[in-house]
């Protein structure tokens, strides 16, 4: 028997970005909605393996929301506030998100620290996108992931102190988010730079942003191995294992 998994989509007509609501940060992309939907089960399996869970199979995606955007969704630019993002958040669920963000951070760091050729350039990735030049080395991707941590926090907080170190910055962001959560749960919708945010959306986006760029890191490592530049690489997210 198939199990329903809810998916919310964002599109500008040129591409579709779908979020799997039951799996915070899990996502699919495609030129068409059908192409994106065809990837849902595999993304769910990969995500559950990363979490150390027994994968669920025979998943049937159900589209529960479609947001039409003028952003470059085909390049994974996103603004959607999921209906789910606005719902009340129990403390147990909040803490689960926090643990997932910590786990995701450790997974990113595992890839980075075990990479021999951090500054090797994958010239085939060179292009412009909505945030500037696409990072074409693992070093640049890691720096981008790191810098965006404070960006997400700044969507709902203006009182931010600079910390040194990737994990230190992440831990600081999570402590700030917890303080906000304990004060207002998930009851407030913030509008920052014309985009709507809630605490749950910030938490979800942390994991999603890690995953989308970690996949690029592992693709570069996979290419390095194929070219004979390295013997092996780490893939803690299980993207290609």
Segments from the language model and where they lie:
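Short, charged, surface-exposed hinge/linker loops at domain edges
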Residues: 2-4, 45-94
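Short, contiguous alpha-helical
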Residues: 7-15, 23-29, 39-56, 120-167, ...
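The catalytic Nudix box helix
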Residues: 36
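Short secondary-structure junction/hinge motifs that connect adjacent elements
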Residues: 57-64, 121-124, 187-189
